[in-house]
Amino acid sequence: SLKLGQKAQIQNITPKSIACIYARSNSAVSDPFFSQIAKAIEQEAFKSNYFIRHSFTAMDIANPDIARQLSQFPVDGIVILGRYEKQLLRFFTQNYKNVIYTGLNPIGDQYDQVVCDGSDISYNALSYLVELGHTKIGYIGEQNNEVRFSGYKEALTKLGLPFLQKNTANVHLSADGGYKGANILMHNKADISAIFCANDTTAIGVIHALKEQNLRIPEDISVISVDDIETAQYLSPMLTTIHIPLE
């Protein structure tokens, strides 16, 4: 016979929630790198009974109505994906107790953060190009307060190579930005044999612009970038990119 023990204690455990903020994107789905990070966060959070309840972009937060609604959402933590404006961080630290940042640009020590060193990435990229025989290397990507750009300049110095502003293009990290950046370098008659792109999405636009000018990659000019997004392996030729562990 079945013997029943003491009445089972049934607990209703309320799952905890997290919001992801795509700080440098107008659309969450437009940033494949941080979309991959968000997916990894969701998988790890689930193991601890947390759920990604909301996803917003910096543009959403700039809307006062959405920002007001967000401040009223009962989430237990905020994860900021990518570089942000100061007012964005101020908004979250004022409204939420648990805020963590992840990206390539370190922020103040007073904040919790998971950072992959952008300076080391830049040095590794340029060192690889130098090993291939390149001594004239351009840069396409954001420049203001961007550790990959400062790392690019530092790497040139360490490798004994000159820095020329005309060999760089300050553009938004997007395929459109990369396309514009490549055309800027060609218009400036940049003296380069290789281009370091700040991320893969930018490199996609760069490659498109170079192909329009009948430049062969890597025969005429080499391109290297950062992130190792899934799309990179389907480009022709396949994009040379530095892997960043997302797990």
Where are the model-predicted features located?
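Flexible loop/turn connectors
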Residues: 183-247
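Short beta->alpha junction loops
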Residues: 53-61, 167-176
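Alpha-helical recognition/docking segments in bacterial nutrient-uptake
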Residues: 13-127, 131, 187, 191
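Periplasmic-binding protein-like
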Residues: 19, 75-82, 138-141, 168, ...
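Hydrophobic alpha-helical segments within soluble ligand-binding/sensing domains
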Residues: 114-139, 150, 154, 175-184, ...
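Short, solvent-exposed amphipathic alpha-helices that sit
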Residues: 32-47, 121-125, 144-162, 177, ...
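N-terminal helix-turn-helix DNA-binding module of bacterial transcription factors
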Residues: 1-14
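Hydrophobic/aromatic beta-strand patches that form the interior of the parallel beta-sheet core
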Residues: 79, 100, 112-114, 138, ...
